[in-house]
């Protein structure tokens, strides 16, 4: 009889053979535009700290002050002993920032998606999601028990065809999409999705994780960027990317948020967000409001890199994520290593995370022109044209 765990070693060998095996890399000290990685100083193009707030002294001071006042942990679920005034202050600030009636904060963005999706739909319902949606949206859909179907990436035509074919068989229908797609950098056709939702009587949940703080005139996300403010939808986002903290949020009308507060298992049955993370996220919103030049500098950096690499097959992007597809996982690893040797940290992204391997570069507001020029030169020397 085989040992019950013997298959794990075989599976690890398969991952190695396919060049899919992953290992952690240890960064010393704070993150930022330049990092210390395993004894080397590298320019960091793998961070989602888009505005460079995670190491901002005001963020750190806010986290320290909250820890001194409230302690290191929230000490319970929000419905029991884990709710503090700073949690509600953050939720109200997010609601105002997103131009929504109310908001609810989860302990992570992943939990926000799982909890929200699973309490909105069930076995009698239909979910239609973009094929390139984030793992948290896909897993939330599976866990809900609803019938789940995917439409071709950013295809309004395929989405409507599936609505025509299936919508009438189900009680409720939920449309799911990232606004900025995390492994491509492109943006969903939000206005078209909302128009179809009105025609076919669907709820809409958008994941603003990579748009919050980055997209739109005020940095509120793609709902603003696409001119869809005031439309009826549910917005989810994260506090761990441009906001430089940890946690996730959901915004919408007051009744929806009240319903989520009463039904979302990943909010009800978990400890509240730590005081430090909560206070840091609240400070980030204030910095974003007061310093629009950070976001402007980020987009200047994005546009500079795009203009210098227009001869390469970069995937279309208006966000801080720029991707160069390559032939296979082995080539992705090889090119990432070449860049590492030139002082650039940009890990290879491989299946099953993405269908086709690629190098993924993320811009930050704190990258200097010199950092960007090193990246452009290194890519030119490393990538086949």
Curated annotation (Swiss-Prot):
> Reaction catalysed by this chain?
6-carboxyhexanoyl-[ACP] + L-alanine + H(+) = (8S)-8-amino-7-oxononanoate + holo-[ACP] + CO2
Positions bearing N6-(pyridoxal phosphate)lysine? 241
- Positions binding pyridoxal 5'-phosphate in this chain are 109-110, 182, 207-210, 238-241
Enumerate the UniProt keywords alphabetically.
Answer: Biotin biosynthesis, Pyridoxal phosphate, Transferase
Enzyme Commission (EC) number: 2.3.1.47
Name the domain of life: Bacteria
Flavoprotein as UniProt keyword: no
Which Gene3D superfamilies has this protein been placed in? Aspartate Aminotransferase, domain 1 (3.90.1150.10), Type I PLP-dependent aspartate aminotransferase-like (Major domain) (3.40.640.10)
* Binding residues annotated for substrate, in chain numbering: 22, 134, 353
Q: Which PROSITE patterns match?
A: AA_TRANSFER_CLASS_2
Per UniProt, subunit arrangement is: Homodimer.
Record-stated family? Belongs to the class-II pyridoxal-phosphate-dependent aminotransferase family. BioF subfamily.
Q: What does this protein do?
A: Catalyzes the decarboxylative condensation of pimeloyl-[acyl-carrier protein] and L-alanine to produce 8-amino-7-oxononanoate (AON), [acyl-carrier protein], and carbon dioxide.
Q: What is this protein called?
A: Putative 8-amino-7-oxononanoate synthase
| Source species | Microcystis aeruginosa (strain NIES-843 / IAM M-2473)
> Which gene is the coding source of this polypeptide chain?
bioF
């Amino acid at each position: 009889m085989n040992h019950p765990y013997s298959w794990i070693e075989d599976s690890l060998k398969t991952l190695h053979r396919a060049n899919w095996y992953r290992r952690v890399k240890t960064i010393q000290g704070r993150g930022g535009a330049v990092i210390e990685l395993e004894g080397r100083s590298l320019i960091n193009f793998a961070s989602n700290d888009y505005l460079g707030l995670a190491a901002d002294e005001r963020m750190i001071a806010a986290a320290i002050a909250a820890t001194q006042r409230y302690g290191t942990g929230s000490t319970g679920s929000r419905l029991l002993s884990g709710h503090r005034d700073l949690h509600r202050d953050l939720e109200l600030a997010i609601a105002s920032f997103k131009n929504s009636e109310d908001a609810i904060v989860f302990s992570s963005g992943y939990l926000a998606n799982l909890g929200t999706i699973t309490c909105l739909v069930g076995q009698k319902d239909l979910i239609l999601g973009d094929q390139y949606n984030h793992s948290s949206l896909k897993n939330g859909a599976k866990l809900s028990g609803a019938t789940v179907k995917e439409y071709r990436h950013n295809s309004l035509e395929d989405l409507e065809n599936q609505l025509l074919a299936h919508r009438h068989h189900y009680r409720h229908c939920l449309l799911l999409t990232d606004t900025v797609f995390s492994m491509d950098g492109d943006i969903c056709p939000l206005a078209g999705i909302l128009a179809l939702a009105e025609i076919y009587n669907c709820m809409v949940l958008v994941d603003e994780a990579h748009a919050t703080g980055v997209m739109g005139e005020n940095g509120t996300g793609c709902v603003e960027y696409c001119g869809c403010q005031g439309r009826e939808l549910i917005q989810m986002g994260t506090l761990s990317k441009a906001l430089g903290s940890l946690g996730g949020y959901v915004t919408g009308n007051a009744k929806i948020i009240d319903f989520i507060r009463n039904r979302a298992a990943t909010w009800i049955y978990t400890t509240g967000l730590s005081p430090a993370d909560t206070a840091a996220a609240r400070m980030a919103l204030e910095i974003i409001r007061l310093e629009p030049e950070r976001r402007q500098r980020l987009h200047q950096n994005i546009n500079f890199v795009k203009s210098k690499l227009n001869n390469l097959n970069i995937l279309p992007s208006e966000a801080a994520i720029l991707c160069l597809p390559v032939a296979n996982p082995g080539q992705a690893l090889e090119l990432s290593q070449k860049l590492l040797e030139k002082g650039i940290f940009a890990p290879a992204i491989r299946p099953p995370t993405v269908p086709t391997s690629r190098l993924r570069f993320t811009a930050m507001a704190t990258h200097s022109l010199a950092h960007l020029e090193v990246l452009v030169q290194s890519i030119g020397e490393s990538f086949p044209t």
